[in-house]
Amino acid sequence: MKNKFIILIVLFFQLSQTYAQQTQKGLLWEISGNGLSQPSYVFGTIHLICPDKFFVPKGTEEKLKAAQQVFLEIDMDDPQMMMKTQKLMMSSDGKKLKDIMNESDYQAFSEYFKKNVGMDVTMFGPAKPFLYMSLAMMKSTGCPMPKSYEEYFVKEAKTENKEILGLETIEDQMAVMDKATTEQQVSWLMEIVNETEKSNETYKQMIDLYTKQDIEALTKMISEQMVGMKGMEEEMLDKRNQNWIPVIEQNIKQKSTFFAVGAGHLGGEKGVLKLLQQKGYILKSLE
């Protein structure tokens, strides 16, 4: 069984022309050329990482300070974010977890959730499965208080009085998750219970690739793990990458911009770096 649960963690919670023919490495990239009057930058994040693995590549803070604005996948500085998220996490049909799972699966997941998260699943009423995944994912990181690159960049941007914007909205992100069938979402919940050790190992492997700044290998691993997800790779990665390009182009033509998005979106033939290359921009790794 592929570790779909871990892929959801990596993707949501939250190349120069010469270099494209080589192994792509580096989390920080410079965007230039194609008539731009000033460079912009794109940084590949991982949404949750243990403090002892957290690092900021040399030059990242300097480039963020040089930029005039900061873009994340979504605007994490939106004062309405928490309220919007809570609303979107609730099932529109009012169904609770026990209504969409068979009795044995519900019992197994309830016990796992209580033991590992320390909460009763009944606390959340008609919450979507993704809420339970979001809370359970803390366990897979292997540390009690994982750090977030998104929170780091929000803090740095505020310190530098930079405007913080989003490439998409929280509504856009949840709409992607809502395209998964109920059966798919239940299977992801049960993977948390039945594939705990394998999921933890997969996550460790991804963190290792991330700290090595090997975005191509990371993208390949994510793609392999998504086999069998019935079109969700296209929804979670490819379409979102395509949707971001016009927003990126519009902004880099006007201001030097620092973008921070999941590292899994950067590599590959359909990744953000390749798509920008195809538009005529020069992508240079600042590793």
Question: Where are the model-predicted features located?
Answer:
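Bacterial Sec-dependent N-terminal signal peptides
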Residues: 1-24, 29
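A cross-kingdom marker for long, charged
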Residues: 231-287
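A conditional alpha-helix N-cap/helix-loop micro-motif detector
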Residues: 21, 53, 146, 237-241
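Short, glycine/serine-rich, charged loops/turns that create anion-binding
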Residues: 12-13, 47, 264-265
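Short, glycine/charged-enriched secondary-structure capping and boundary segments
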Residues: 20, 56-57, 85-86, 272-276
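Structured, acidic catalytic/metal-binding patches in enzyme active sites
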Residues: 28-41, 46-232
